[in-house]
Amino acid sequence: MKFVDEVSIRVKAGDGGNGCMSFRREKFIENGGPNGGDGGDGGSVYMVADENLNTLVDYRYTRHHEAQRGSNGGSTDCTGKKGDDLFLRVPVGTTVIDASTQEVIGDLITPGQKLMVAQGGWHGLGNTRFKSSTNRAPRQTTPGKPGDQRDLKMEMKVLADVGLLGLPNAGKSTFIRSVSAAKPKVADYPFTTLVPNLGVVSVDRWKSFVIADIPGLIEGASEGAGLGIRFLKHLARTRVLLHLVDLAPLDGSSPADAAEIIINELAQFSPALVDRERWLVLNKADMIMDDEKDERVKEVVERLNWEGPVYVISAIAKQGTEKLSHDLMRYLEDRADRLANDPAYAEELAELDQRIEDEARAQLQALDDARTLRRTGVKSVHDIGDDDDWDDFEDDEDGPEIIYVRD
């Protein structure tokens, strides 16, 4: 199934049903009076988080969604039927945004969570509602109110405990294959991974966590090189990042340079994401001699001034991966325990999470704006100058400019 994590749709709630104007007409009953019923309310539109979905592809080709209209009122004080609500199922981790105001309507982060995105219209009133002591036969009704209509953007971020970060061919997919049952494609060329992959790492019988593998970054990704940096949004909700570095790159490049490239691109996307807990994982240690391995590890650590955990592993040979998995599980458990018992720590993490979300949202919006400009033939907003010559389409030739003024 095709992986789609961003779509734009239009939703329309159902209009309310109109009120009915009717009078009681029955044998032997004179001046029966009004008996027009109210209309029914229009159906609303809801988003529902479904844990069985992992892509927004269903909304790529069906972009208009409308809830049912409320029925009109009837005679004998019959109220119209309420329109059926429309439930749109989306993957867990979907953010719903109003496309016109860029306001975040809500995040669907728990299975079964519901979010109303368009309110159904109110019902109209029948003429029975308007009878009074001075108006025994009212001929007044009200129409139903129109339902809300909204243009929405939906962005899906995978929900994972651990995120993998690194250059292409750093061994991210091989690592996730070695520690979980996930089987992402692995090959010896760049950008083998084109979409995020999730794997469940079982540490003990009752202990596990979810790990996310995203496409690799290259230098200049923040400016659109390679696959860009849009996929970094999937790391915004992770609890810890594993920074994978290839100790034995095929092109003979420096592992320290590769590590710096990733950190720079990460900072371009979200400076707050750099403050997330990050562990340095040096992969492919089995491909070089021990002396050279120690020298390269020392070079990377010193170049980055790294103070966090450092692991030297071989994902393909499963060397060091088990210890890393156990340490990750222990860290996640300690983190959850501290969140529950330390309010100051919980507040600090909540503030960091919000900063990451805000910066990621702003970065994605900037990328969308740039894409819109490119579609209109403008490379950037700086190319739009102050053009005061508003009528320069036809009269830019040399010579006097004549402006006709109507008396």
Curated annotation (Swiss-Prot):
Annotated ranges, domain Obg: 1-159
Residue spans of biased composition, Acidic residues class: 385-400
Subcellular location: Cytoplasm
Keywords: Cytoplasm, GTP-binding, Hydrolase, Magnesium, Metal-binding, Nucleotide-binding
Region (Disordered): 127-150, 378-407
EC top class, as a word: hydrolase
Sites where the protein binds Mg(2+): 173, 193
Names of the cofactor(s): Mg(2+)
The keyword RNA-binding is assigned to this record: no
GO cellular component, one term: cytoplasm
Top-rank taxon, per record: Bacteria
Composition bias, Polar residues: 129-143
The UniProt record lists the keyword Metal-binding: yes
NCBIfam families recorded: Obg_CgtA, PRK12297.1, PRK12299.1
Family: Belongs to the TRAFAC class OBG-HflX-like GTPase superfamily. OBG GTPase family.
Subunit structure: Monomer.
Function: An essential GTPase which binds GTP, GDP and possibly (p)ppGpp with moderate affinity, with high nucleotide exchange rates and a fairly low GTP hydrolysis rate. Plays a role in control of the cell cycle, stress response, ribosome biogenesis and in those bacteria that undergo differentiation, in morphogenesis control.
Name recorded for this polypeptide: GTPase Obg
